[in-house]
């Protein structure tokens, strides 16, 4: 009945989501991962790394605007921003929208992914790699954080999921979050992508619980990302601000004053929606006591 090729993405050991592939555009292997650019029937171009869809042309803006803007809009004129991961360049694109930003340092471990993105994901990065404020570093984010002498107003963690035995696991631990806090300015904060409350609620809750041991103000936001086929979670942390406390009028005023260009997903109403977390998820994260550590790092189920 259905003769096309399928991309099967396992969400748990017992569940997968299938996307029909129109064609494989490019496939490369690096020292670290397998990278595919495919054209999906429903979502168009899709970046797939190690079997996991990272983003698609049809809805990448939902994920990237939700990751970046609630934190940056809650801070007072962020000038120096650090991004770990984010190889597509779309997180960089959104951070550079802020009029106050003077420098965005982006650290990604894989030069193949960066070259791949520059050449093939123009709709994602929109030239952000060539912005004079961009400081692109190919390297290990963990090592960079340990060695940098700079302080940042905001840190954005656009990392791959903490799959069991992957290098990313150590970037979701209390030790690493303390290292990050040491390079954040007193008026700053961070945000991390936090996997899916739909498929890995325990993981989401443990990341939240872990950040609560490091920062005074921690809030969870969620939104539906169609190509991920589920809710996606983001956790924002700071000692001085909490984006969940801002209302739609404050958000809309700040966007008008501080942000260049036109956003497709995020505005005041969407901001309030992000923080309307369902009761069962609120109860889960508030009651979670487990903490991710180097000795026992959090992991997704698949």
From Swiss-Prot:
CDD domains noted in UniProt: AdoMet_MTases
Cysteines paired by S-S bonds: none
Pathway entry: Amine and polyamine biosynthesis; spermidine biosynthesis; spermidine from putrescine: step 1/1
Keywords: Cytoplasm, Polyamine biosynthesis, Spermidine biosynthesis, Transferase
Residues the record marks as active site: 158
GO cellular component, one term: cytoplasm
Positions that bind S-methyl-5'-thioadenosine: 33, 108, 140-141, 167
Taxonomy, superkingdom: Archaea
Gene Ontology annotations of biological process type: spermidine biosynthetic process
GO molecular function: spermidine synthase activity; thermospermine synthase activity
InterPro entries, per database record: PABS, PABS_CS, SAM-dependent_MTases_sf, Spermi_synthase, Spermidine_synt_N, Spermidine_synt_N_sf
Catalytic activity of the protein: S-adenosyl 3-(methylsulfanyl)propylamine + putrescine = S-methyl-5'-thioadenosine + spermidine + H(+)
Primary localisation category: cytoplasm
PROSITE patterns the UniProt entry points to: PABS_1, PABS_2
Binding of spermidine, residues: 64, 88
Domain PABS, residue spans: 4-239
Pfam families reported for this sequence: Spermine_synt_N, Spermine_synth
Main function: Catalyzes the irreversible transfer of a propylamine group from the amino donor S-adenosylmethioninamine (decarboxy-AdoMet) to putrescine (1,4-diaminobutane) to yield spermidine.
Sequence similarity: Belongs to the spermidine/spermine synthase family.
Protein's recorded name: Polyamine aminopropyltransferase
Organism phylogeny: Archaea, Thermoproteota, Thermoprotei, Sulfolobales, Sulfolobaceae
